[in-house]
Amino acid sequence: MYIGVISMRYAKALLAYADEKGTEDTVYEEAGILADSFSRIPELRQALDNPVLPAETKLKLICEAAGGGKVSEELKRFVELVLEERREKFLQFMIMSYICLLYTSDAADDL
């Protein structure tokens, strides 16, 4: 599968889940912080790509990068799913896809 296909599928699932819980704006803010962390801290991506690092450690790193350790339950559960499915190497692309999806859906709502 292509990175874009996988990322978009997960991003749509996160958007639907956050929308169902009414937390899409909170998750959007956390996603923005996480996307910025990926850009500023290349070691974050390297850590996620490390197969020796346990999933629990990766979860803590991601939560710290997304909001100082305090993130919404929705984002945390999403990241747990990504780690469980061993798709963490696509997480940066999933987050960017989520931001784009929410941004374009908000823009469409304004029309």
What are these regions, as identified by a protein language model?
Residues 1-105:
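Elongated, mostly alpha-helical coiled-coil "stalk/stator" tethers of large membrane protein machines
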Residues 106-111:
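A short, hydrophobic C-terminal helix/tail in secreted or cell-surface proteins
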